[in-house]
Amino acid sequence: MRTRGGIVTKRRRNKWLKLAKGYWGHKSIGFKVAKQAVVKSWTYAFRDRKQLKREFRKLWIARINAAARPLGITYSRLIEGLKVANIQINRKMLSELAINYPTAFSQIVEKAKTSLAKK
């Protein structure tokens, strides 16, 4: 007599189906397709965790550049000026200053400009 898949098999399948809950169509019902969808979602999640960091850095740079240009300096010259002036501030904080505290940002820009002029 043939032995059928018992409780162990059912538990294993339900574990994968639970991870696929909310997926569209057969991806949340069929075991094989659900397992493939879950594994694929993990690869997307891994890739996009790395990509998110890149996207935010691009956003911060764009904001800094947009705020610095009316003050008469480009982004690259501003970063160079900050390095010469030995001002260690990251791009995220510079972006926050540019948006929420424009006067503080303009003071930092002026220090960067003066350090570039002395160079």
From Swiss-Prot:
Coiled coil spans: none
Keywords: Ribonucleoprotein, Ribosomal protein, RNA-binding, rRNA-binding
InterPro entries: Ribosomal_bL20, RIBOSOMAL_L20_CS, Ribosomal_protein_bL20_C
GO cellular component: ribonucleoprotein complex; ribosome
Pfam families, A to Z: Ribosomal_L20 (PF00453)
GO BP term (any one): ribosomal large subunit assembly
MF term (GO), any: rRNA binding
PROSITE patterns referenced in this protein's UniProt entry, alphabetically: RIBOSOMAL_L20
Top-rank lineage group of the source organism: Bacteria
Family membership: Belongs to the bacterial ribosomal protein bL20 family.
Described function: Binds directly to 23S ribosomal RNA and is necessary for the in vitro assembly process of the 50S ribosomal subunit. It is not involved in the protein synthesizing functions of that subunit.
Protein name, as recorded: Large ribosomal subunit protein bL20
Organism: Metamycoplasma arthritidis (strain 158L3-1) (Mycoplasma arthritidis)
Underlying gene: rplT
